[in-house]
């Protein structure tokens, strides 16, 4: 997928996460921890892309460089999928990479699971992410607060992308 921001074209693609990507993902999670609570799929044992078990997990590649991760997962028995995405450092923000990655991951997921809504939670203070999700078609459907292990309480929005 090609996109442009500020006149600079960026080629964005996805590749399935493999077990040997975990060290990079852990390092990237350190950057993302300041603006999101969850940097991995819900299945704590997951370490790779596994569509047969409902996990579509990808490394985001921009201009040939690994720059983040995106996942769509369908927990067993769930009536909606869950989306997560993050980029590895601030230099990649605001370039359209997140929106492109979400669209690519959703296309793969929906080829196997048409007609399911996709949900996420995003910190209310994360305006850049909220704008990204809105560009991808998500709408705010509710709000709440989450208590972090540190004791901090973080307000969030629930967002949903309706089925196609």
Report the location of each language-model feature.
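A generic structural micro-feature
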Residues: 77, 96, 151-155
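C-terminal "cap" of GNAT-fold acetyltransferases
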Residues: 115-119, 123-130, 135, 143-164
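Short acidic N-proximal helix/loop "leader" segments that mark the beginning
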Residues: 1-8
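A short beta-loop-alpha structural element at the N-terminal edge
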Residues: 11-25
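Conserved N-terminal glycine/acidic-rich loop preference
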Residues: 71, 77, 83, 101-102, ...
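Acetyl-CoA-dependent GNAT
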Residues: 16-20, 30-93, 99-108, 112, ...
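Residues within well-ordered alpha-helical secondary structure of globular protein domains
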Residues: 27-31, 135
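Conserved beta-strand core positions
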Residues: 12, 81-83, 118
């Amino acid at each position: 997928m090609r996109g442009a921001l500020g006149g600079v074209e960026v080629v964005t693609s996805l590749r399935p996460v493999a077990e040997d990507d975990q060290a990079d993902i852990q390092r990237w999670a350190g950057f993302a921890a300041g603006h999101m609570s969850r940097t991995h799929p819900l299945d704590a044992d997951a370490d790779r892309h596994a569509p047969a078990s409902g996990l579509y997990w990808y490394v985001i590649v921009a201009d040939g460089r690994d720059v983040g991760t995106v996942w769509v997962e369908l927990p067993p028995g769930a009536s909606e999928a869950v989306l997560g995405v993050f980029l590895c450092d601030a230099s990649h923000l605001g370039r359209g990479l997140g929106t492109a990655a979400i669209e690519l991951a959703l296309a793969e997921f929906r080829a196997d699971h048409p007609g399911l809504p996709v949900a996420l939670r995003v910190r209310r203070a994360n305006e850049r992410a909220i704008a990204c999700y809105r560009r991808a078609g998500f709408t705010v459907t509710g709000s709440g607060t989450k208590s972090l292990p540190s004791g901090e309480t973080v307000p969030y929005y629930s967002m949903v992308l309706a089925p196609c």
